[in-house]
Amino acid sequence: MSNIVVSPHSLSTLAGIEILRNGGNAIDSAIATNIVQGVVAPETCGIGGDLFALIWINGENKPYCLDSSGYAGSNVDLSSLSSYTNIPLDHPMSVTVPGAVRGWYAMHERFGRLEMKDLFSQAIEICSKGFKVSSELHQSLKTVSYTHLRAHETDY
């Protein structure tokens, strides 16, 4: 059987390939790829985001759908939002509790083959050795800089 791993960043793709070479399945590879993508391109995904997956297991003739989207925090006060027709993207109430990590573990529990700790190995190595920051990540970090965050500190 042939496999293919595709992601927006070469290091993420290589992590997924390495998992397959080490006996992991497509789910293990997808999780490891997503974990590394969150390291090398956190502006695209990562532990602070959500996860949605449509999984097809060969021979089962049915899809599995995972919605691991975030939910509102327990202290949300909807009355404080009544003056808004839309919640501004930079408002604290626009943020949810992240669901990505919960999604990784849910997928792994049901479909994974390797140990979960093995799926983090490439990300840990990349964090330890460092990596070249892409122009996209540089721009994203520049846009959401300390100065921008300070401008909204009274909103919190």
Locate the predicted segments by residue.
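A short, hydrophobic C-terminal helix/tail in secreted or cell-surface proteins
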Residues: A151-Y156
